[in-house]
Design a protein with these regions (language model features):
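N-terminal secretory targeting modules
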Residues: 1-17, 201-204
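Conserved SGNH/GDSL esterase-like catalytic core that processes O-acyl groups on lipids
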Residues: 15-17, 23-102
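Substrate-gating cap/lid alpha-helix
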Residues: 131-167
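Histidine-centered active-site loop/cap adjacent to the catalytic His
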Residues: 177-213
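Intrinsically disordered, low-complexity terminal regulatory regions
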Residues: 210-290, 358-360, 364-381
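Regulatory sensory and allosteric helical modules in signal-transduction proteins
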Residues: 262, 267-268, 272-276, 283-327
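A short, aliphatic-rich beta-strand micro-motif
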Residues: 327-336
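Short beta-strand-to-loop transition segments that serve as allosteric relay/switch motifs
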Residues: 344-353
Length: 381
């Protein structure tokens, strides 16, 4: 399988987490793009017109008992929506309805507590047990009946929570002999999810001028986030290393595509900005206090500065009033494999240009290409 992520093109992206087991595992297909993450990203984008980033945290061993510990390590405040798929194991193990209700209530309350105030949670019901070939038997009928009972409880618990929605699961279509699940099954499930998710995502999407959770963070939270971000930077092992063609190629493409004098993949490291890759006559290292990237990484979306000389954040910046006389900047955050914003893919020019001329979809795609290289490097390492 490829990296546990999927993306669909667009701007103003929604960030989704799929967590659990069962349909989240992607059995039957060769990539997450063909499985539920990719299918859901495309289905949501088709409805919203926005980009979608889907992160996957799935394991066959994940259960209702292990879920709280696994979820609290994922920084849930990053996500606009969280999809949970659990229950088949509990249905087959005949977990008591009382225990299921108690533990599920605790889990979903934890999710609402640890996520942001605009995050919506979607609890996917059990796939009909006998639609799973290995359990299509009289013994499977017992688990199937219990799964229905657990789903009734799940629906009741979800109804009692303000940001949680229950979505009943459908059976996978009967596929070719010997094949368990196909890309068609994942597309169908993604459409089912997207039908329920689209409206809450639209309603919860931050309007211009609203404060993001990151902007509302208390000073101590900002410190904690910065420490986690720096650990992610250090863990990549790329600081002060030689240029690599895999990054330089993407940066050069950015420069050509946007027609700018400079382009770079920048990394914010303690009190400096260091460029892992850059094209054009631009310093490889500058103080963080002068860095446009330092502003870019404060939010998940793009930063576009049409004319730095008229922007109050940058008009006194030594790089604007002196060499190299930056006027235009566009950057998109680059995330580490663990989700911290460690730098940016950016393009810069000494001439201003209208914001409307900037292809933000392309800028995001180039930043995602850098992220893909970072993730591949982490897997190899």
């Amino acid at each position: 399988m490829d990296a546990p992520q999927a993306h669909s093109p667009g701007t103003d992206s929604d960030r989704i987490l799929i967590f659990g087991s069962g349909p989240a595992l992607g059995w039957g297909v060769l990539s997450h793009d063909l499985a539920l993450p990719g299918a859901l990203a495309r289905a949501l984008s088709a409805r919203s017109g926005r980009g979608v980033d889907v992160d996957l945290a799935a394991s066959p061993a994940t259960s209702l008992g292990t879920a709280p510990r696994e979820l609290t390590a994922l920084r849930l405040c990053r996500f606009d929506a969280i999809v949970i798929t659990l229950g088949a194991r509990d249905a087959l193990n005949l977990t008591s309805v009382r225990v299921w209700r108690r533990e599920l209530t605790a889990l979903l309350r934890l999710l609402e507590q640890e996520s942001s105030r605009t995050t919506h949670i979607f609890m996917l019901g059990n796939q009909p047990i006998r639609s799973i070939p290995v359990f299509d038997s009289l013994l499977g009928s017992v688990g199937a009946r219990h799964g229905v009972a657990l789903d009734r409880v799940t629906a009741e618990v979800c109804q009692s929570l303000p940001r949680t929605t229950f979505i009943a699961m459908t059976a996978a279509a009967r596929g070719e002999a010997g094949r368990f699940r196909s890309a068609t099954d994942y597309r169908n499930w993604a459409e089912l999810l997207a039908d329920s998710m689209a409206a809450p995502l639209d309603a919860g999407h931050l309007a211009p001028g609203d404060a993001s959770p990151a902007q509302e963070a208390a000073p101590q939270d900002v410190r904690v986030l910065e420490e986690a971000r720096q650990r992610a930077v250090d863990g990549l092992g790329i600081l002060d290393t030689d240029p690599e063609e895999r990054f330089t190629r993407i940066v050069a493409l950015a420069q050509r595509s946007f027609g700018t004098r400079w382009a770079a993949f920048t990394v914010t490291d303690h009190d400096r900005q260091w460029d892992k890759a850059n094209v054009g006559p631009f310093p490889q290292e500058i103080p963080r206090s002068r860095s446009f990237t330092d502003v870019t990484i404060r939010d998940p979306g793009p930063l576009v500065v049409a004319d730095a000389q008229t922007d109050p954040r940058f008009r006194a910046n030594p790089l604007v009033v002196g060499e190299p006389f930056i006027r235009f900047y566009a950057g998109f955050p680059v995330e580490s494999p663990s989700g911290e914003r460690i730098g940016a893919l950016c393009v810069l020019d000494p001439m201003p240009r209208p914001v409307g001329e900037i292809d933000l979809v392309l800028l995001r795609e180039l930043a995602l290409a850098v992220q893909g290289e970072l993730r591949r490097g982490a897997l190899v390492g």
